[in-house]
């Protein structure tokens, strides 16, 4: 199934929260996770904790077309470091973006690369700030395998969320298994209607602990932080099927 990535705010924020959480143990580095369709490079998604102004300028000017880091990543499989010399060594004459990046102290970095089955380039770049260069370089060098796996897991989560959104938007009538079990869907439905766990338990004739158990499974399936995020994602992506009226059981 071909997936078309777009800038869906909630999905992007979900992935950014995931990356922020995972990167805390690596010193909270500045990062940019970029996904670009190699057949249609104008289709790009950027999830980053770089300065917002820099990300907006990059996206609005389609700088992925002239970014030496991205142009190098297209032809790479293994991770690589970069700085001003990349423009010279790669014989790319696109120094304009590096001149802009200097204004935001984005001069040196390290990029991890992934090419997915949908012909997309996924690149996770870390900015190595000058005042922390030795510390961050050592962290990256000692954890390259873990950071590469982080890119893979983040991209898998992103792909899964967009795939599910695409299925629901197209009202697919295939017989593939539902994302949620019947009970999980019922609980999500009532939670999205503003019911408390105790009220849901009464409506469905189950215990509050059972409600919490199923909500925990939903949170895991969606790869989000908590029940509130799961309910919001379920509503925004139309993942929750309507259920019939239920009477409280005594």
From Swiss-Prot:
Matching SMART domains: HTH_LUXR
Domain of life: Bacteria
Annotated GO biological process: quorum sensing; regulation of DNA-templated transcription
DNA-binding region: 197-216
Keyword Secreted: no
Matching InterPro entries: Sig_transdc_resp-reg_C-effctor, TF_LuxR_autoind-bd_dom, TF_LuxR_autoind-bd_dom_sf, Tscrpt_reg_LuxR_C, WH-like_DNA-bd_sf
Keywords annotated in UniProt: Activator, DNA-binding, Quorum sensing, Transcription, Transcription regulation, Virulence
Gene3D superfamilies: Transcription factor LuxR-like, autoinducer-binding domain, Winged helix-like DNA-binding domain superfamily/Winged helix DNA-binding domain
Domain HTH luxR-type: 173-238
Purpose: Functions as an OHLL responsive transcriptional regulator that acts in virulence (soft rot disease) through the activation of genes for plant tissue macerating enzymes.
Family classification: Belongs to the autoinducer-regulated transcriptional regulatory protein family.
Protein name as annotated: Transcriptional activator protein ExpR
Organism: Dickeya dadantii (strain 3937)
Protein encoded by which gene: expR
